[in-house]
Design a protein with these regions (language model features):
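Acetyl-CoA-dependent GNAT
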Residues: 9-15, 20-89, 100-101, 106, ...
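C-terminal "cap" of GNAT-fold acetyltransferases
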Residues: 113, 120-127, 132-133, 139-165
Length: 165
């Protein structure tokens, strides 16, 4: 089975594909992604209205099989929040790890010093990926009970981000 998927930037016109991808998954598969399951429209609206936030998709044979994003930049946060979703049909092929590497490289190239994420404490596989990649558990989110993790990025190659106009 070919597991290759290309990474492509997502645009507002891709919002319906994102909704269709989430809608095609079972509640059981979505159990670790409460925001994707309970409010996919909010995600699609975030993509439609993005400015500084970054959204990428995994395309396999032209079909969206996953997406990942760095959010919070539109709201002025200096530390973006990483999120990733891979369809069950494309899971266990290393796409989440590729997504994380791509997002972290983008942050470093933009002079961003750290990234945060939230992960369900029962999602042992994802937690192990994040710990292996240097994320530290910093606290539990009181609203979602998810573990908040953070990673400081390498500063020696950072360039300064231009000030907003």
């Amino acid at each position: 089975m070919n597991t290759y998927a290309e990474i492509a930037e997502l645009y507002p016109s891709d919002a319906q594909d994102l909704l269709d991808l989430i809608a095609g998954e079972s509640d059981d598969y979505l159990r670790y992604t409460p925001n994707f399951r309970s409010s996919p429209q909010t995600l699609a609206d975030g993509l439609r209205n993005r400015q500084a936030d970054r959204w990428w998709g995994f395309l396999k044979e032209g079909e969206l099989v996953g997406f990942f994003m760095l959010r919070g930049l539109d709201e002025g946060y200096k530390q973006p929040a990483f999120g990733v979703f891979v369809a069950e049909s494309a899971s266990k092929a290393g796409l989440a790890t590729r997504a994380l590497a791509h997002a972290l490289a983008w942050c470093e190239s933009e002079g961003i010093g750290s990234v945060m994420l939230k992960v369900d404490p029962a999602n042992h596989r994802a937690r192990q990926i994040y710990l292996r990649e240097g994320f530290k558990e910093i606290r539990v989110c009181p609203a979602t009970r998810q573990q908040i993790m953070e990673k400081q990025l390498t500063t020696r190659w950072r360039r300064r981000r231009p000030a907003p106009l």
